[in-house]
Amino acid sequence: MESTIQQRLRITFAKGEEIKYISHLDLVRVWERTLRRARVPLAYSRGFNPRPQIAFAAPLPVGFTSRGEVMDVVLERRISPYKFAKGLMPHLPPGLELLSVEEAYPKLPSLQSQVRSAEYRVTVAWDGSREEMEGKLQELLSAEELLRQRRGKDYDLRPLIEDPVSYTHLTLPTIYSV
């Protein structure tokens, strides 16, 4: 089966609570099925086992939700991003939400090579004051190293925090305010 690239669409989607416990490979299969049900003219790889040409920016860990997952879909026939989105919406399973569809230049570097960082939002149960939480956060961010042991090996997580200034925003629910 020979396929020619006619169009590449960049899709931004949300992975919600309903599907946060499915693996990345299962998510890929869900997207493949959804695109097939919507009769999207997917381009396929060459070879003995042709696969739809779908590429994700980065796998999301199991148990995480996201409002900014990105994937590229290669089509063998041109279709407007609006028509693509409109045709896909009724076939999306609960937990997947289409946020945007844009045309992407077919020769762009892969999504995986373009990922530079990720931003996480963490909810922490806290029964102390706002000032105590801010102090703990500043203590964490001013540490020279943040060691974590995994599989018997120590890792320093501190170099992975790029911009501590952006992490100082703190919102506590009203039940915790003093």
Predicted regions located by residue number:
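Conserved small/polar residues in nucleotide/adenosyl-binding loops
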Residues: 168-174
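N-terminal, positively charged regions that mediate nucleic acid binding
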Residues: 6, 10-53
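Ordered, amphipathic secondary-structure segments that act as subunit-interaction surfaces
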Residues: 67-121
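Long, contiguous binding/interaction regions
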Residues: 135, 145, 150-159
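Short, intrinsically disordered, mixed-charge
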Residues: 27-41, 86-94, 138-142
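Short, charge-patterned binding micro-sites
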Residues: 43-75
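Short glycine-/aliphatic-rich beta-strand segments at the starts of folded cytosolic domains
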Residues: 9-14, 118-124
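Short, conserved charged micro-motifs
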Residues: 79-86, 128-136
